[in-house]
Every structure is written in C-alpha cells, then in structure tokens.
Swiss-Prot record:
UniProt organism field: Emericella nidulans (strain FGSC A4 / ATCC 38163 / CBS 112.46 / NRRL 194 / M139) (Aspergillus nidulans)
Gene3D superfamilies the record matches: Histone-lysine N-methyltransferase, SET domain
Gene transcribed to yield this protein: set9
Residue ranges, compositional bias (Low complexity): 348-359
Family annotation (InterPro entries): Hist-Lys_N-MTase_N, Set9_fungi, SET_dom, SET_dom_sf, Suv4-20/Set9
Record's protein name: Histone-lysine N-methyltransferase set9
Extent of Basic and acidic residues compositional bias: 608-625
Protein role: Histone methyltransferase that trimethylates 'Lys-20' of histone H4 to form H4K20me3.
Compositional bias ranges of the Polar residues kind: 361-381
Homology family: Belongs to the class V-like SAM-binding methyltransferase superfamily. Histone-lysine methyltransferase family. Suvar4-20 subfamily.
Region of interest: Disordered: 261-388, 596-628
Coarse class of the protein's main subcellular location: nucleus
Compartment(s) of residence: Nucleus; Chromosome
C-alpha cells in the first residue's frame, strides 16, 4: 500500500505549470518574429528589458510565409511549421527543456499567426497619445464589429502570479499586462495579441476568461472601421479614480490627465534647501563690510538676480603689471645684506584678516610693516634664505577678486617674479627671518588666495615646501602649486511635483517629432491620418499602417480579400511593383503649409480635417492637367523630330 506522502505528491502537470517567466519568454520571441519582422515600422515593447532579438529572421522570409500560407492558403499549421524551421526559431525551440514547454510555445505562437488571417477583424498599430515621442502598440479595427460579439483571434494566455513573482516584478513600472481577476481576486499575468489593447475609461471591449488559462475580448458596443479597440484596466489603475488617465474619452471631455491645462501647474520646488551656514565655505566672494552686514542682516526670501556682465582684464596683463610693481618696490627699498634676508608675514596676515571685511584689499603700508628685526638664533635658522626668496615672499597685497582662477594663475606669476631675481642680488645683507603663519583666512597675496576649507597642516606643508632653496646656488626653486582641497559641495536638485501638462491633440502635428530638417507631417491618402515622414524628399502616399497592410495583403487598407465574385481587383503578390510616393501632379495639389509648425486641435483620424489641399484645388487641378499635357506634347515633338 503506498504511503500517504506518495499519494499527496503533486502530479507532473501541476509541477510543470506555465510560469510567468516562461510565458514572458514565449511572448517576446513570438512578437519579435511575427510583429517586428513583418514590415512593422517600430519595435514592440518586450517583457524582458534585456531581450536580444532572435537572429536568423528576415522580414522578406517571414512576410512571404504569411502571404502565401496564411493570407492566401489560410493554412495556419503549414505556416507554423515553416516559421519554426527558420534558423533563429529552430535554435530557440531546441533550447526548451521538454516537449511540454515546446507545446506551450507552439500554442502561444499560433495565436500571433492567426492575426494575419483575412477574416481577422483587427490588426496591430501604434499610437503616441500617451508619451508623444514614443509610439506604443495598439489594436485597430479593420472590420465592423457588432455589440456583444466576441472579437475573433483577439485572445491571450492568462497565468496566475505567486507572491514571490509579485515581489520580484517591478510594480513601479506601469505594466499593462497585469489584470485582476474578479472571480479569483488575485493578480494574473496576461500575454498574447490582446495585450496590445490599451485602456479607456469608456472602453468598447471587455476582457472575459475562457477556461483556466485563456482570455478573450468581447465588444461592449458597436466598433467601426478605424476605431481603436480598448478595454478597461480597472478603476484605480492610473492613480486614485484614474486621475492620471490619458485615454481618448478623457481627452474629449477633457478630464483626469488632460485637465491639468485648465489651471497653471504648480511651481516646482527644490528637493533640498539652500545651505545657509556653509555659504562662507562654498562661495568665493568676500564678506561685506560691517556696516553693510548690519544693514543687510535679514536674508532675502527670493534669490537675487544675476548682476550685469562686467568685462574682466587680461590675465597676462595683470601678471606683467604685478611683476613691474614688485621690481619697482625692490629698487626703492634701502639696500640690505642679501645673505640672510627674510620677511615676516605675521603682520601681513593680520592686515589681510582685517581687510577681508571690505570689498577691496588695499596695499598701503604692508611693505614697511612686514620687515621686522629678529634674534640671532632665528637668523641661524634662516641662513638658507636668499634675496630672491625674500622678494617673492614679501607680502604684497593686490586689488583682485579671490576667484577660482586665482589658483590657476599662481604658477605664471611665480615664474615672472623669478625672472626678476637678478635685481635683488644687490640688496645688503641683514639677518631677517621669514616667518609664515599658517592662516587659512581669506587673504589676497601674490601666491593667490586659497580656499577657506584648506586644513592648517596642508597650508604649512605647502608654504614650507615652497621656501626651500638650493644650497649651492641663488636660483629660486619653482614653488609647488597649492593643492586644491576637496570640498563637499551641495548641489540643488529640482524635482518637478507634477508631470508635463498635456493639451488635447498635442501629439498630432507637433514639432517635437521633427528631429531633422526634412522631417514633415504628411496626410495619409488612404485613412486621412497624420503621420511623420523622415527625410521626406519625396512624399509618401500612405501612413506606415496602410503601407504595411498593402505590402502584406496586396490590397489597400482595410481590404484583405476579394469582396465577392464581381470584384475584379487582383491581389498584388509582389509589393515592390507598387509606387508608394506621390506623383508631381499630386504633389502640386498638397499644401505644405503647417506641416510641423503647430499641432492640430483634433486628435483622432475620424475627427481630423480632410487632406490638406489648397482652397483653389480645382484650379490647381486644371493647371496640373495643363502641365501634364504640355509635357506630353513636348515629348511627342521630340520623338517626331
């Protein structure tokens, strides 16, 4: 007798159930082979973000199978075998582990093949109503569908989602393939041809389940040719009460996502407040004088306007003038011994601190105050000093703004001062020591002002390394360029509180889609819908949907086969024999005014204006016929001569 544990084990069918990952993989391959590779003008969105298209699939090969086996012969099984015999599909089918998964893939692939049967009342198209710049898939009716009728071949496969799959799925991304079952009260993943049906608050279709893993779309009202087939995703799918919905019904009212244009949008606020305490560390400007600070102590609530542009002087000119001033000051000073000459920067630093409260730093009195007497012990420690070093380290204040460019101009200034070193060799020798106090306060000297966040130890190391001299010569070593300190800067990031305000019809005849010079908005001569033609040196006759339909079926949209025994129109089996551009006579009848400058106010093809002809179209027609007659007469004259 078998144990209870063996009896309670699940069956093979239940263990090998169709999962979300498997169904998503099947759907990506099926849409790649039978939608993207069937003369489709864009790429459909895949379920896996890192999906790689199947190699070995050619558009002409797939279209040939669909035309001869599905459209003409109406043999879905033969078309399925030929498609699976393609190199890329055969390679993918061989990777499936068992026969059960291969059977699941064949069933799912057959749903996409049936879309191309002549009796199918719909076809896949695109719309840019929701994103303007990107076209998303949609379902368009090409036959009249009465109310209550089940839309043929508009079906899909339904897979229940587990708790783990719900956590792994990125719910922040609006995935329109997730449906909530009203009977099971659980979310399910829904893929197949019906997944291309978009949402509408007044939808003309309804999703109904067929069996445990099937789903179908039923028409809730009459659907006419050219109308988009839509379903309802739920009451709160696009926010609370669908407040962000951009469907056609909301666009006509307008409401929800289209109602933002009625009132001005809220102003965006910065996500991080402006730094108040660290303003002195981040801004390179000097502090104001004490009187100005007292008068302007209350901070302004609004940001200040940017001042007018003031031309700055040349950096090279300022460096040359700096060198001349230093040379003149050296010659005017009393001669001192050049063996042990040094300067004290103590008082110069103090004067720099006191002068930092004003707008400009004055240079009066700094030369005489910086020379101080020192003790013999201090003179022994400064025996390595030379006249050139003391001249360079002399505290000379400048009327310059402490900008970031001051650090970069320090090296050229030092080289220019070093060139004046022979002038300082005649100075008499005295025991004067160079005393440098590591002050990090904002001061303006010859070596340029450092940032306020420089550490004291880095200041001492940089200045001490710059004052070392060679023992055997009196040449000045190149002063080490001060390191730029690493400061933490606060960058304000502005996050808009609301999305772009949408205006009804802003996705039609908008200049946002005209990326190149010769991109134009063109009116389709078959369905009267506006579309963007890139590089329109020659104007196309039909939109991408109508052109794809004629390439696959051999008839003009929405015709798929002969309408009866009295129909004499023959199917075009080779689409390359059709001229798909306007003739010069037809080009003269079309007005080029407003083809991308502004967008229309009517968003849908059935409500849009007719073909963009000029008011005097009859007169232009006669002129065109006259031009054609003249050309023919001229050609006859040439041949007779």
């Amino acid at each position: 007798m078998p144990s209870s544990k063996a009896r309670s084990s699940p069956s093979v069918d239940r263990r090998e159930r169709l999962t979300l990952a498997k169904l998503a993989s099947y759907d990506d391959v099926a849409t790649d082979a039978l939608v993207d590779c069937a003369y489709f003008w864009t790429k459909t969105r895949k379920n896996r973000t890192k999906y790689i298209p199947v190699r070995g699939l050619a558009e002409d090969t797939v279209a040939h199978i669909l035309l001869h086996d599905v459209i003409v012969a109406k043999d879905v099984s033969a078309a399925e075998r030929k498609i699976l015999d393609l190199i890329g599909m055969k390679r993918y089918l061989a990777k499936l582990p068992n026969d059960r998964e291969k059977d699941w893939f064949r069933k799912h692939l057959r749903k996409y093949i049936q879309m191309y049967l002549p009796d199918c009342p719909f076809e896949v198209t695109t719309t840019n109503r929701y994103t303007i710049t990107e076209h998303e898939a949609a379902i368009c009716a090409r036959k009249f569908i009465p109310q209550g009728q089940e839309i043929k071949y508009l079906s899909g496969t339904l897979v229940p989602m587990t708790k783990e799959e719900e956590r792994d799925l990125d719910l922040k991304r609006k995935d329109f393939s997730i449906v909530m079952s009203s009977r099971r009260k659980t979310p399910s993943f829904f893929l197949g041809p019906a997944r291309f049906a978009n949402h509408d608050c007044s939808a003309n279709g309804r999703l109904v389940t067929r069996g445990s893993e099937g789903m179908q779309v039923v028409a809730t009202r009459d659907i006419y040719i050219g109308e988009e087939i839509t379903v309802s995703y739920g009451e709160d799918y696009f926010g609370i009460d669908n407040c962000e919905c951009l469907c056609l019904s909301c666009e006509r009212v307008p409401r929800n996502g289209w109602s933002q244009n009625l009132a001005p949008g809220p102003q965006s606020k910065p996500s991080t407040p402006e730094p108040k305490a660290s303003e002195d560390h981040l801004t390179p400007r000097k502090r104001k004088a004490q009187s100005d600070i007292d008068s302007d102590s209350s901070p302004s609530s609004t940001p200040r306007k940017r001042g007018k542009f003031t031309p700055r002087g040349s950096k090279l000119r300022s460096q040359l003038s700096l060198t001349e001033d230093i040379a003149i000051s050296i010659e005017s000073e009393p001669r001192v011994p050049s063996s042990n000459l040094a300067l004290s920067a103590q008082e110069a630093g103090d004067s720099g601190k006191s002068s930092s409260a004003g707008d400009n730093v004055e240079s009066s009195g700094t030369d005489s105050e910086s020379l101080t007497s020192i003790t013999p012990q201090e003179s022994q420690r400064s025996s390595a000093s030379t006249a050139a070093t003391s001249v360079f380290d002399e505290a000379v204040s400048l009327n310059t703004r402490p900008t970031k460019s001051a650090v970069t101009t320090a090296a050229p200034a030092e080289s220019s001062i070093a060139a004046e070193a022979p002038l300082s060799t005649t100075i008499p020798e005295t025991d004067i020591k160079l005393e440098v106090e590591p002050s990090c306060e904002p001061t303006t000297t010859v070596t340029a002002q450092l940032d306020t966040t420089v550490r004291a130890d880095s200041c001492v190391s940089d200045i001490s390394s710059s004052t070392k001299l060679e023992d055997g010569s009196e040449a000045l070593e190149h002063v080490k360029k001060p390191r730029k300190p690493r400061t933490k800067r606060v960058y304000l990031t502005i996050e808009p509180e609301s999305k772009l305000n949408r205006v009804p019809g802003d996705y039609t005849k908008t200049p946002k889609l005209l990326a190149h010079s010769y991109d134009r908005w063109v009116d389709c001569h078959t369905c009267n819908a506006w579309f963007v033609q890139q590089n329109s040196y020659l104007t196309r006759r039909e939109c991408p949907r109508c052109e794809r339909h004629s390439m696959l079926y051999g008839f003009r949209w929405p015709k798929t086969e002969k309408e009866g025994p009295n129909d004499d129109e023959e199917r075009v089996m080779d689409h390359r024999t059709i001229h798909r551009f306007l003739y010069p006579e037809e080009e003269a009848l079309v007005s080029r005014r407003g083809r991308g400058v502004s967008f229309g106010l009517t968003p849908t093809p059935e409500l849009s204006d007719m073909r963009s002809e000029t008011p005097d179209s009859e007169a232009l027609d006669e002129r065109g016929n006259t031009r054609v007659t003249r050309r023919r007469t001229r050609a006859i004259r040439v041949t007779t001569v």
